[in-house]
C-alpha cells in the first residue's frame, strides 16, 4: 500500500513540473537517509541528542517542509516566502514528532487510545530517554539501568515508565519541544498579519501541546 501511495504521489507531482519533481525527490532522499540513521546507533563521539534531532529533521521535518514549500510555491508566493514556509514546515514536523514521543511516555491511555511505553519496549531512545540517560543524579541510577537494558518484560517496562514519568527528563524534553515550536512561529514574523498567519501560529500550538 505504501508503494502504491508513493507511486500515486509521484504521478500527481509529475503534473506540477520539473521543479516540483526535484523537490519531491530531494525530500524522499532525506526521508530515507533519516530512516537509515534511525536504524543505526549514534556514532561514537557524536552527541546522541543532536543525532536524534537530526534524524527527526530528515524523517519528519523534510516531509512537512515539502508540503509547506509546495503550498507557498503554487500559491504564488515570492521566493523568500517559499523558503520561509519550508523552514517553518520543517520545524513544525520536528515539533510534531517530539510531541508524539512524549505522548508515548506521559499520556493517559484512556484519553489517547495508545499503549504507553511502546517506544521503550522496542528500545527506541526518544528525547526524554536520551536526557534521562545523560543524567548523573545517583537517585536515578535505577532508571538509567532499566533504560540501558531489555524492557520487553512487562514488569521492567512498567517500572521504567513510572520512573521516567517522574523524572525531570520528561519536562526537559517538553521544553525542547516548545522551543522548536517557538522557532517555527518566529519564522512567520515577516509575514503580514492575516487569518492565514494566525492559523499557522495556532497550528504550532496545537501540535506542541497535544495530548493524543
What are these regions (language model features)?
Residues 1-141, 179, 205:
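Mg2+-dependent prenyl diphosphate-binding active-site environment of isoprenoid biosynthetic enzymes
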Residues 17-20, 49, 78-81, 139-140, ...:
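Residue-level recognition of alpha-helical structural elements
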Residues 30-31, 91, 149-153, 166-167, ...:
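A short structural micro-motif
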Residues 86, 175, 198-202:
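Short, charged, amphipathic alpha-helical segments
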Residues 132, 189-190:
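Short amphipathic alpha-helical boundary/capping segments
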Residues 140-188:
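Mobile late-domain/C-terminal helix-loop "cap" segments
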Residues 180, 185-186, 193-212:
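Short, amphipathic C-terminal "tail helix"
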Amino acid at each position: 500500500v505504501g508503494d502504491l501511495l508513493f507511486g500515486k504521489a509521484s504521478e500527481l507531482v509529475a503534473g506540477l513540473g520539473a521543479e516540483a519533481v526535484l523537490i519531491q525527490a530531494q525530500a524522499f532522499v532525506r526521508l530515507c537517509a533519516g530512516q537509515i540513521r534511525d536504524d543505526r546507533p549514534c556514532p561514537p563521539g557524536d552527541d546522541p541528542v543532536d543525532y536524534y534531532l537530526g534524524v527527526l529533521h530528515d524523517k519528519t521535518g523534510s516531509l512537512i517542509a515539502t508540503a509547506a514549500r509546495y503550498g507557498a510555491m503554487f500559491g504564488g508566493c515570492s521566493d523568500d516566502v517559499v523558503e520561509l514556509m519550508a523552514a517553518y514546515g520543517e520545524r513544525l514536523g520536528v515539533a510534531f514528532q517530539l510531541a508524539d514521543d512524549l505522548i508515548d511516555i506521559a499520556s493517559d491511555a484512556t484519553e489517547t487510545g495508545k499503549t504507553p511505553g511502546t517506544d521503550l519496549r522496542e528500545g527506541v531512545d526518544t528525547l526524554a530517554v536520551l536526557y534521562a540517560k545523560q543524567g548523573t543524579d545517583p537517585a536515578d541510577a535505577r532508571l538509567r539501568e532499566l533504560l540501558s537494558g531489555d524492557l520487553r518484560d512487562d514488569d521492567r517496562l512498567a517500572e521504567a515508565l513510572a520512573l521516567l514519568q517522574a523524572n525531570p527528563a520528561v519536562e526537559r524534553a517538553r521544553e525542547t519541544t516548545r522551543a522548536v515550536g517557538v522557532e517555527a512561529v518566529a519564522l512567520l514574523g515577516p509575514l503580514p498579519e492575516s487569518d492565514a498567519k494566525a492559523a499557522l501560529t495556532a497550528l504550532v500550538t496545537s501540535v506542541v501541546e497535544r495530548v493524543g
